[in-house]
Amino acid sequence: MYAGTVLATAPRRVTPTTFAVGRFADIDATTKTDIDSGARTDFWQARINTKGVSDLHVLQNTIAPGGTFGWHSHPGPSLVIVKSGTATFYMADDPTCSPQVVQAGSGFVDNGHDEHVVRNEGSVDLVTVVVSFVPAGFARRIDEPAPANCPALPNG
């Protein structure tokens, strides 16, 4: 599929701190909250459903200016909150390799199996808090080679 050697891109200038890892059996949690009691039709809803034993990881990452997570994917979904700084991420399946910017106080969802890179292109530390679900015993991160459509991103 690839001509020549394909190298994964490693994280640079990233300091991870694991807060907790917990193991869960099948999860089937659903909640629905009426947010407009007068209308009774306006609901907020959440659903978490897993089949099989899962590991839940909660961690904080501090990424110095110019730092990068390198190209990678995850075997399960992650919820990412940008605590401070600005996260700039790129998706391998985006033909234009356009940056997506997430400011402090906002977040994004990584559905899992999406090859991407998150970088700190700002001038202050980027701090993220991440909650990841992965199959029990699996590594949370899978290193990936830099995609051909993102040549302007040296080292991911």
What residues fall within each predicted segment?
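Short beta-strand His + acidic residue motifs that chelate non-heme Fe in jelly-roll/DSBH
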Residues: 71, 89-90, 98, 110, ...
